[in-house]
Amino acid sequence: MVQIFKFLLKSNKSPARAHFRPSFLDTLRLAVRGGHGGNGLPKYGGVGGQGGCVYFVAKEGLTLRKMAQGLKDRRVAASSGEDSSKVSIFGKRGVDTRIEVPVGVQVYDEQQKLLADLNENDAKCIVAGGGTGGCTGNNFLGRPGENRIVNLDLKLIADVGLVGFPNAGKSTLLKAVSNAKPKIAAYPFTTIRPQIGTIEYGDLRSISLADLPGLIEGAHANFGMGHKFLKHIERTRLLLFMVDIFGFQLSPRHPHRDCLANIYSLNKELELYDPSLLEKPCVLLLNKMDKEGAHDILTKVKPIIDDLSSGLADCPEEVRPKRVLKFESIVPISAINSTRVTQVKSQLRRTLVRLAEKQFVSDGEQIKEQLQQRVGLVGPRIT
């Protein structure tokens, strides 16, 4: 009878497809606690050992998911300091706990105050200090270590961030130009997690390209998990916008936007999310040029795309930005046929090289200015 009831109560729901199971983790919440300070010894004036601290170290090649698998209960603690004794007047310090985290992690406390930005390999930060050992100042009673909740927020570090609406062909392009193998299908939101591909060149130079899930209108207000995806382009050096030359319609309930309206809409989403993103250099790809009528549309919209401010008057008010983008270049392509893909790779490289040269000159001028300020009237001026 028991077996019959088990059979009847057994759920007939099929498990979720592997594609929709969460495999990309970009946030993690941890409870961290520094070690308790050791007690002192009043009779001999002994001092207890300092409690150990918890610190993070950034390591390349690590992911938050791998890190989380090693921290099942999401709790991290350092060891306590040693009590003072007759044979050890000064107690030994507690052992520190070292936790490796992915490069690109930002550490926040519960009040969303930034504690550390670990964007370089081997960068370190203490997230929970150890308690003070017992001494005359605290009646020889060791103090508890720092106890707090920290949130780890991973922002992908890539040279180029690929931005666009769903079904624009971003994953197809990523597969064509890099070693990545993203899922590709003829429906929106095929990409449901960020992916990074590497563009390799004949001289062994490589460029990393981050493909983000498609945005929707209102992404700046976190519609469609917009914040979860937009944050990953903050650390990219170059933005690569990709737009369907025939426009895009999210669903029958949403209006159809032509390619110009889509460009303005993406422009506005970035402007509302973080205006500083508009200062990043950007390249525009107009995709699906292999279809009939594409070149007629291109001829019509190209002069406006060259100067987006000239088309603001005709832009729908709900997608009209206050400040427009200025594209470094505009490349019409067919990602599915790999048309002009080589040109895209060359353009990305040229733009990044030009940015590096500008940064080098800027850094040199800054160093020169700092040296002049230090020398002042004491030594010769640098000319």
Swiss-Prot record:
GO annotation, biological process? ribosome biogenesis
- Keyword Metal-binding in record: no
InterPro entries documented for this protein? G_OBG, GTP-bd, GTP-bd_Obg/CgtA, GTP1_OBG_dom, GTP1_OBG_dom_sf, OBG_GTPase, P-loop_NTPase
Q: Which GO terms describe its cellular component?
A: mitochondrion; nucleolus
Tell me where in this chain the OBG-type G domain is found.
158-353
Q: Which residues bind GTP?
A: 164-171, 211-215, 287-290
Q: Where is the Obg domain?
A: 22-157
Name where it's found: Nucleus, Nucleolus
Write the record's keywords in alphabetical order, separated by commas: GTP-binding, Nucleotide-binding, Nucleus, Ribosome biogenesis
Give the GO molecular function terms: GTP binding; GTPase activity; magnesium ion binding
Per the record, the similarity remark reads:
Belongs to the TRAFAC class OBG-HflX-like GTPase superfamily. OBG GTPase family.
List the PANTHER family hit by this protein, alphabetically.
DEVELOPMENTALLY REGULATED GTP-BINDING PROTEIN-RELATED (PTHR11702), GTP-BINDING PROTEIN 10 (PTHR11702:SF43)
Role according to the record: May be involved in the ribosome maturation process.
Put simply, this protein is called: GTP-binding protein 10 homolog
- Which organism does this sequence originate in? Drosophila pseudoobscura pseudoobscura
Q: What is the lineage of its organism?
A: Eukaryota, Metazoa, Ecdysozoa, Arthropoda, Hexapoda
